[in-house]
Amino acid sequence: MEQAPEDQGPQREPYNEWTLDLLEELKNEAVRHFPRPWLHSLGQHIYNTYGDTWEGVEAIIRILQQLLFIHFRIGCRHSRIGITRQRRVRNGTSRS
């Protein structure tokens, strides 16, 4: 009968430590791209909804990841990631 292999990989850091590190990185990145009052309001909304829980931490991580992804995808002027905007020359025709 087969046995499960023993875990011989490197020690993983605890989930809560990893989660807090990820949240800190996301907050630092978000502050560079969004207004602080807006981020503060988001944090207040999460706190009012979830309180001081891990569920709240996971929710704000998920929201910040989505916001930053969309922000970069649309074309952040600070980043080379995203849709390249082509300059259009007006020639009188509309292709809407």
From Swiss-Prot:
Q: Which UniProt keywords apply?
A: Activator, AIDS, Apoptosis, Cell cycle, Host G2/M cell cycle arrest by virus, Host nucleus, Host-virus interaction, Ion channel, Ion transport, Modulation of host cell cycle by virus, Phosphoprotein, Transcription, Transcription regulation, Transport, Viral penetration into host nucleus, Virion, Virus entry into host cell
Q: Does the keyword Iron-sulfur apply?
A: no
Q: What is this protein called?
A: Protein Vpr
Phosphoserine, modified sites: 79, 94, 96
Free-text function comment from the UniProt entry: During virus replication, may deplete host UNG protein, and incude G2-M cell cycle arrest. Acts by targeting specific host proteins for degradation by the 26S proteasome, through association with the cellular CUL4A-DDB1 E3 ligase complex by direct interaction with host VPRPB/DCAF-1. Cell cycle arrest reportedly occurs within hours of infection and is not blocked by antiviral agents, suggesting that it is initiated by the VPR carried into the virion. Additionally, VPR induces apoptosis in a cell cycle dependent manner suggesting that these two effects are mechanistically linked.
Give the chief site where it resides.
virion
Q: Where are the transmembrane segments?
A: none
Of which family is this protein a member? Belongs to the HIV-1 VPR protein family.
Q: How does it assemble?
A: Homooligomer, may form homodimer. Interacts with p6-gag region of the Pr55 Gag precursor protein through a (Leu-X-X)4 motif near the C-terminus of the P6gag protein. Interacts with host UNG. May interact with host RAD23A/HHR23A. Interacts with host VPRBP/DCAF1, leading to hijack the CUL4A-RBX1-DDB1-DCAF1/VPRBP complex, mediating ubiquitination of host proteins such as TERT and ZGPAT and arrest of the cell cycle in G2 phase.
Tell me the compartments it is located in. Virion; Host nucleus; Host extracellular space
